[in-house]
Amino acid sequence: MQRRVEYHRDAAFALRRMDRATSKRIRSKIGQLADDPSALANNVTALKGGAGLMRFRVGDWRVIYTDELVVLKIMKVAPRGSAYD
């Protein structure tokens, strides 16, 4: 069962502002994660002190999200250096 993907406004803004190829690559990985939670298993890490926040890498970009049973909420998409601010 594919989960519904919801984007926080900051994450949606970041995806719109980046170049098209990178945005497409990140959206593809998010889609894979929504389809199959174990698809990116070796690339997903729980954030310390993040109250259920998880992250995965796409090149030098980090996608921070919460994983609920039916909804995958994308909270932040940012370059590696500023993703954890």
Task: Give the label of every model feature segment.
Residues M1-F13, R17-K24, S28, M54-R62, ...:
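Enriched for short, Lys/Arg-rich terminal
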Residues G31-F56:
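A short, surface-exposed loop/turn module that caps and links secondary-structure elements
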